[in-house]
Amino acid sequence: AADRLEADFRNPRRPDLVGRVSLGDPSAPVTIVEYTDFECPYCRQSVAVIHQLLNRYPGKVRLVIKQTPLEMHPNAMPAALMFEALALQDGAKAFAFYELMYAEQERLKKEGQRFVEEAARRVGADVPRALRDQQGDQVRALVAADIAEGQGFGFTGTPAFVVNGVALEGAHPVENFV
């Protein structure tokens, strides 16, 4: 792990952030890129940690979400696609959806696309547009690129993070991010 950390400092990982929505100050000096799966219980735990970081360091930290739905979680892909569809409309709505998916993760697991659509409505999205975009080539290509990027970084599970170029895999306490 120490060797990998040193390698990341020498040659930082550079996730593609072009056109991605973020939570927190877009010009913050620290960028946390989270590779997430909306059905992953460890990803759900990480939401509280991310909130602590954003609240503890206002203006200093921003969060960018990358989609890495695992095959073992069949409802993670529709949720991932919807997050990105909503991001095309409004970043704030996409992040409200992110919060809702983790707050009501059991409903996502049980209800799948039906809950994804309900959540899009609840965050105030243009649902017909979101449903079109959810199935569209642009959103599908974006999620496929996120998956490939995470695999290219050697990530084998979720959550995984890249913090200013340095990788962290798994759920971590706040202290590991600062």
What feature does the model see in each segment?
Residues 10-11, 41, 138-139:
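Short, flexible loop segments at the rims of nucleotide/cofactor-binding pockets, characterized by
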Residues 2-17:
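Long amphipathic alpha-helical scaffold segments
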Residues 14-30, 55:
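A short beta-strand-turn-helix
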Residues 33-121:
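Structural alpha/beta surface segment adjacent to cysteine/selenocysteine redox centers
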Residues 23, 108, 168:
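Short clusters of hydrophobic/aromatic residues that line enzyme substrate/ligand-binding pockets
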